[in-house]
Amino acid sequence: MKIAIVGTGYVGLVTGTCFSEMGIDVTCVDVQESKIENLKKGVIPIYEPGLEDMVHRNYTAGRLKFTTDLEECLDDVEVVFSAVGTPPDEDGSADLKYVLEVARTIGRNMNKYVLVVTKSTVPVGTAQKVKSTIQKELDERNIQIEFDVASNPEFLKEGD
């Protein structure tokens, strides 16, 4: 199985690394080129016990890859986890702009079935918004491709 994790912050990097540790091929995607280049060099931006060794081991083994280009890996993966930030909006609600941008990118570039899993902590109803956003992009491309959307929000306490 091959998966992509969009977002290499605490949730995305730990999730992707743990999947790769289980033998799954993982591509971690982030828009910050410097972050991706640092990860390729073994510079881990967060602290979690054992994470640095796991990243190194799985990157060296080829099970863990890093890129800034989600489009390039969509044809190879079966599952895309969206673990992007949801900063508070002016009214305190979760700002979904990054979550929906991931959905737009998937809809604009997917060519086969994919399961989209939202890991970001988001309000009820977000899965339907993600599904509608992807479907709108597919409709604009005038193609029909099956896909599913699931929610697997992360609630955690970051390491000390």
Predicted segments with their positions:
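Rossmann-like NAD(P)(H) cofactor-binding subdomain of soluble oxidoreductases
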Residues: 88-155
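Glycine/serine-rich loop-strand microenvironments at binding/catalytic pocket rims
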Residues: 10, 16-23, 27, 68-86, ...
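NAD(P)+-binding Rossmann beta1-loop-alpha1 motif at the extreme N-terminus of oxidoreductases
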Residues: 1-43
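Short, intrinsically disordered, charge-balanced linker/junction segments flanking boundaries
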Residues: 158-160
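Conserved N-terminal Rossmann-fold NAD(P) cofactor-binding segment
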Residues: 25, 31-79, 85-93, 133-146
